[in-house]
Amino acid sequence: MGKIKELQTSLANKIAAGEVVERPGSVVKELLENAIDAQATEINIEVEQSGVASIRVVDNGTGIHIDDLGLVFHRHATSKLDADDDLFHIRTLGFRGEALASISSVAKVTLSTCTDNEEGQQIYVENGEILDQKPAKAKRGTDILVESLFYNTPARLKYIKSLYTELGKITDIVNRMAMSHPDIRISLISDGKTIMKTNGSGRTNEVMSEIYGMKVAKDLVHISGDTSDYHLEGFVAKPEHSRSNKHYISIFINGRYIKNFLLNKAILEGYHTLLMIGRYPICYINIEMDPILVDVNVHPTKLEVRLSKEDQLFNLIVEKIREAFKDRILIPQNDMDKITKKNKVLDQFEQQKLDFEKKQQQENHSQPVNSHEEDEKNDDKAYHSSQTHYEPTDYILKEENNTSVSTSPNSDDDYTQTQKSVLYDLENENQSEFINEADFDSDISNHSDSDIKGSVSKDPSRRVPYMEVVGQVHGTYIIAQNENGMYMIDQHAAQERIKYEYFREKIGEVTNEIQNLLIPLTFHFSTDELMIINQHKEELDKVGVHLEPFGGNDYIVDSYPVWFPTAEAEEIIKDMIEYVLEHKKVNVKKIREDAAIMMSCKKSIKANHYLKNNEMADLVNQLRETEDPFTCPHGRPIIINFSNYELERLFKRTI
């Protein structure tokens, strides 16, 4: 007797729900997409217990015809596709016809709907089966209530994260939907508290202000561009608002939020040298294209897509982001509010430290003095170490046993405070990678400042204001002033930028001339590595790296192109071969870029190097003539401004 049998519909729906309905946020996403496809201009979302208890989505869209109610909870039943060819011309957010069937198989669903010319209807569904249908008073649109999510799949319920995390996921989904559809009024309410709401003005920057705050919103730069196949619109935040993960990069295609590694890479390339390693921008990018150029039918969640002509789109994004910042002043303003908050934290920490030391003195009064002094030194080290990676944040810091917010309906901060708390909980707090001045090589430059000055633009940029140098702090930071306030300049970062642009130009021409190595480099490759090297050996030859067989899986390199810096030639060759092994291609542009960064870093003045006033003034003038004077090649800021107003606030001259 055969063993294969067709699964029951309810079981098949539960299996399908495992891909479509992963968590409460998945339900919100699917219902939001349906509301948007129904041409709603207002959508209200209410959740209880972060969506685990209930999710309600109410819209004023076209509603569902009474004749369609019997099919709406069937798998693969949809109004958005008809013929095979429609799959290649999708302009709606939903199209698979799986969402409602999947949701109703793992939750209890009540749906009320009304079209323009019909009486309202209400149906109740459990386990994918319609148990009740009756006429009901309803406004035009659809009202869906999802209760007891995963009530019949306890294994799925077990893997639900904390309520705060789940609310964060929901908030994130609603935020992105609001960004991509600013013409729709959207609100999110959690346990009676308003988390976010938009006014449907049609302006994306207003929605971003609602999500990220006014400070970020006023530093958003609009970008726009076209190719024969793509139209790009978006907003990119200034580098000073960078974050510790990619969560704040929002990419949309025809209004659909997507995740794409190559497009993420294009955005980071557009910010090249403006962001530190491990830092990521806040940005919104929407790409309009013919649907035939994108395949959205890759995964049930519809987050992953396949694109045609990706290289063209990559170059467009890079170009427009670079243009956005090319002529802008990117000197970060010092934030007094953050300093005040930080000082409160430091004061509390210092008081705790003093109390602890006093207690230790009382308990160990018989201990020798030098032992106590040693402990005090260790405490100081621990204290300073704990503050080394302190990073001011725009988010509300969670306090133990105190996550409550104002519930007053008249409070402007009600929903923003809650949302910021949720976003803080959601964000991955990865430590940024910092450049340690002490680790830099102490070699000095072989090129004079006059040589370098001549290599950069002769037309001084107006982006760096003229300022008078007045001093230096710890042989590391230059202090300057003008009528707008005080400026602090990191001398190492400043010279690093100057020399980077000089070396980038110097090694920009790839020639066929070679220089012999005194001692050849030897490389041993595994069998699979050897196959990759042999495949790309011709490309390596073209850039002047000639690998010669040396027996078995060993190869030698005995020369290098003259455009390689002599001191770094060996390291560049090794990096190039490692790059080929990892990426299976040769990237000459990246090699030149890395070489310029390496040389500028090693040959710039270091911290604790005292300069004369005329040397500092000359350094500032050289910086003014560079193309990108605000960050070093690693993305660290070069200049920070303290306005006159901020200085007066520090000394309580103004409030």
From Swiss-Prot:
For bias type Polar residues, the affected ranges are 402-416
| Single GO MF descriptor | ATP binding
Compositional bias ranges of the Basic and acidic residues kind: 371-383
> Keywords assigned by UniProt?
DNA damage, DNA repair
Q: Which CDD domains match?
A: HATPase_MutL-MLH-PMS-like, MutL_Trans
Gene Ontology biological process terms in this record: mismatch repair
Q: Which PANTHER family match?
A: DNA MISMATCH REPAIR PROTEIN MLH, PMS, MUTL (PTHR10073), DNA MISMATCH REPAIR PROTEIN MLH1 (PTHR10073:SF12)
Cited function: This protein is involved in the repair of mismatches in DNA. It is required for dam-dependent methyl-directed DNA mismatch repair. May act as a 'molecular matchmaker', a protein that promotes the formation of a stable complex between two or more DNA-binding proteins in an ATP-dependent manner without itself being part of a final effector complex.
HAMAP family with a match to the protein in the record: DNA_mis_repair
Family designation:
Belongs to the DNA mismatch repair MutL/HexB family.
Task: Please give the name of this protein.
Answer: DNA mismatch repair protein MutL
UniProt gene name: mutL
